[in-house]
Amino acid sequence: MSKARVYTDVNVVRPKEYWDYESLVVQWGHQDDYEVVRKVGRGKYSEVFEGKNVNTNERCVIKILKPVKKKKIKREIKILQNLCGGPNIVKLYDIVRDEHSKTPSLVFEFVNSVDFKVLYPTLTDYDIRYYIYELLKALDFCHSQGIMHRDVKPHNVMIDHQLRKLRLIDWGLAEFYHPGKEYNVRVASRYFKGPELLVDLQDYDYSLDMWSLGCMFAGMIFRKEPFFYGHDNHDQLVKIAKVLGTNELDHYLNKYQLDLDPQLEALVGRHVPKPWSKFINADNQHLVSPEAIDFLDKLLQYDHQDRLTAREAMDHPYFAQVKAAESSRLRTQ
């Protein structure tokens, strides 16, 4: 059995009310307090609008949920409530529903974010260090509260570049971590799925988020979005194996006594690891440093137990400048 290296027993020692989301009694607010301004996006499970609170004129984001199991909605609400006020976690303001259709909506703080496909190519080396560090604060916090996000990707990281403000959003796939529990492997978005999901290891943990973060980081420093571009879940593992090598994959499978299905094994083939230096080119070399490569290498490990935790990641030398700037800013406040 595999268990998390950190924050293993958070939900074991907390009262049942903390993690037992099925028992949540939702306190509904008033839908009339909000009006929709414009549509800003849609996901598999929701449509998202910019809105405003008609009483205060304050901008907000309204996430109108598509018909989905009540249990899943309660899970998202409970997690958002548990994490509210944590560093760089999107704030849930209210939960409302339509009187007639009973369609629930979640009301969040507004973040004036730019599409990552537009923003990322403009980021400097320092910007990337800064924003990844801000994202790590959110991840370490949610992990410390016994929660895995399970859908870390650029689309779920809102950045207001003018205010240098980052928020981790969309907690719809997030789940409470219970040691030894077997989870659904059909989570995360394909390009950010950890090897554990692709080889059907079900007793995964917070370290799944660290793989997804590694994929996101690789995309940013190498300017290759997405970094692992699989056409389906099988091909996703092939794309990973072509970079990390197949001996290392075998080692991982053996350690956890897993077998690949023969069809997948044939697709994966045999590959030697590809050095990270092979991804450096004239376009991205200003973003790649020895410490960036070292940091990436410690995230993109097949074995989830070998990946840096969010806390360990924050202590990596890659963030030394960011931490120095942060402590001097705090001193001068």
Swiss-Prot record:
<dbReference type="GO" id="GO:0106310">
    <property type="term" value="F:protein serine kinase activity"/>
</dbReference>
<dbReference type="GO" id="GO:0042752">
    <property type="term" value="P:regulation of circadian rhythm"/>
</dbReference>
<dbReference type="GO" id="GO:0005737">
    <property type="term" value="C:cytoplasm"/>
</dbReference>
<dbReference type="InterPro" id="IPR011009">
    <property type="entry name" value="Kinase-like_dom_sf"/>
</dbReference>
<dbReference type="Pfam" id="PF00069">
    <property type="entry name" value="Pkinase"/>
</dbReference>
<keyword id="KW-0418">Kinase</keyword>
<keyword id="KW-0539">Nucleus</keyword>
<dbReference type="InterPro" id="IPR045216">
    <property type="entry name" value="CK2_alpha"/>
</dbReference>
<dbReference type="GO" id="GO:0010225">
    <property type="term" value="P:response to UV-C"/>
</dbReference>
<keyword id="KW-0808">Transferase</keyword>
<protein>
    <recommendedName>
        <fullName>Casein kinase II subunit alpha-3</fullName>
        <ecNumber>2.7.11.1</ecNumber>
    </recommendedName>
</protein>
<dbReference type="GO" id="GO:0005634">
    <property type="term" value="C:nucleus"/>
</dbReference>
<dbReference type="InterPro" id="IPR017441">
    <property type="entry name" value="Protein_kinase_ATP_BS"/>
</dbReference>
<keyword id="KW-0067">ATP-binding</keyword>
<feature type="domain" description="Protein kinase">
    <location>
        <begin position="34"/>
        <end position="319"/>
    </location>
</feature>
<keyword id="KW-0963">Cytoplasm</keyword>
<comment type="subunit">
    <text>Heterotetramer of two catalytic alpha subunits and two regulatory beta subunits.</text>
</comment>
<dbReference type="GO" id="GO:0006281">
    <property type="term" value="P:DNA repair"/>
</dbReference>
<dbReference type="GO" id="GO:0006325">
    <property type="term" value="P:chromatin organization"/>
</dbReference>
<dbReference type="GO" id="GO:0004674">
    <property type="term" value="F:protein serine/threonine kinase activity"/>
</dbReference>
<dbReference type="GO" id="GO:0007623">
    <property type="term" value="P:circadian rhythm"/>
</dbReference>
<dbReference type="GO" id="GO:0051726">
    <property type="term" value="P:regulation of cell cycle"/>
</dbReference>
<dbReference type="InterPro" id="IPR000719">
    <property type="entry name" value="Prot_kinase_dom"/>
</dbReference>
<keyword id="KW-0547">Nucleotide-binding</keyword>
<feature type="binding site">
    <location>
        <begin position="40"/>
        <end position="48"/>
    </location>
    <ligand>
        <name>ATP</name>
    </ligand>
</feature>
<feature type="binding site">
    <location>
        <position position="63"/>
    </location>
    <ligand>
        <name>ATP</name>
    </ligand>
</feature>
<keyword id="KW-0723">Serine/threonine-protein kinase</keyword>
<feature type="active site" description="Proton acceptor">
    <location>
        <position position="151"/>
    </location>
</feature>
<comment type="similarity">
    <text>Belongs to the protein kinase superfamily. Ser/Thr protein kinase family. CK2 subfamily.</text>
</comment>
<dbReference type="GO" id="GO:0010332">
    <property type="term" value="P:response to gamma radiation"/>
</dbReference>
<dbReference type="GO" id="GO:0005730">
    <property type="term" value="C:nucleolus"/>
</dbReference>
<dbReference type="GO" id="GO:0005524">
    <property type="term" value="F:ATP binding"/>
</dbReference>
<dbReference type="InterPro" id="IPR008271">
    <property type="entry name" value="Ser/Thr_kinase_AS"/>
</dbReference>
<comment type="function">
    <text>Casein kinases are operationally defined by their preferential utilization of acidic proteins such as caseins as substrates. The alpha chain contains the catalytic site. The tetrameric holoenzyme CK2 is composed of two alpha and two beta subunits. Acts as a circadian clock component that maintains the correct period length through phosphorylation of CCA1.</text>
</comment>
